[in-house]
Structures are given as structure tokens and as C-alpha cells.
Amino acid sequence: MIDDIAVPLTFTDAAANKVKSLISEEENTDLKLRVYITGGGCSGFQYGFTFDEKVNDGDLTIEKSGVQLVIDPMSLQYLIGGTVDYTEGLEGSRFTVNNPNATSTCGCGSSFSI
């Protein structure tokens, strides 16, 4: 876990509060939000979010408001400088990634290229 040093990724209050709410609904305080990148989507890479009880060797863990965001080292290299947020709007509610490393994104924002 990172404390008081430069964190390479921002985990917003909105995202942390939604994670806290979802963990409460599941009644499992061991859950953490894992963000990862896989190949696919219309732009080459896509973001994924899942709840995970494990933190693997090499994972980066960012804690906010009593909940944890976990990123594997391979995904982190594509996410440095980014922001994990939670938004609600006309397209529905979802976790999002604002990624300054992406050179282009698809219309829905779920895939990107570098």
C-alpha cells in the first residue's frame, strides 16, 4: 500500500464511495476493486473492473475512504497518470478511467490505443 508518496494513479472520492457502497451490499469487507487492461475493444486495449479478495505480488494498492483499488504491474504501466472515477449520467452509471496515455479512445470510452 502507498502512503504519503507520489501515487501514479488517482482514485476519486466518487469511485471510492461507490466501491464502499458495493462492498457493503456484498457484506464482504475483503473485497477490493481491481482495474486492469486487456487486449480488445475497437481501439486495441480495453479497461476492466472486477472485485477481488486477493492482492498478488507486485500489485499496487491505493487506499481511499477505507477501500482499496488494486492494479497489476502490467496494467499499471498503461495507467500511470490516470484517474479512476465513478460517473452517473445519461449513459448509465459506471466506473471510468481518464487515461492521459491513450492516443485515441472509442466512442463509449471503454477501449483505447496507445
Swiss-Prot record:
Residues bound to iron-sulfur cluster: C42, C106, C108
InterPro entries: FeS_biogenesis, FeS_cluster_insertion, FeS_cluster_insertion_CS, FeS_cluster_insertion_RrpA, HesB-like_dom_sf
Family under the similarity heading: Belongs to the HesB/IscA family.
Gene giving rise to this polypeptide: erpA
Example of a GO biological process term: iron-sulfur cluster assembly
Cofactor note: Binds 1 iron-sulfur cluster per subunit.
An annotated Gene Ontology molecular function: 2 iron, 2 sulfur cluster binding
PANTHER family per record: IRON-SULFUR CLUSTER ASSEMBLY 2 HOMOLOG, MITOCHONDRIAL (PTHR43011:SF1)
Self-association state and partner proteins as the record states: Homodimer.
Cofactor: iron-sulfur cluster
Record-level GO cellular component terms: cytosol
Organism name: Haemophilus influenzae (strain PittEE)
Its biological purpose: Required for insertion of 4Fe-4S clusters for at least IspG.
Protein known as: Iron-sulfur cluster insertion protein ErpA
Keywords, comma-separated and alphabetical: Iron, Iron-sulfur, Metal-binding
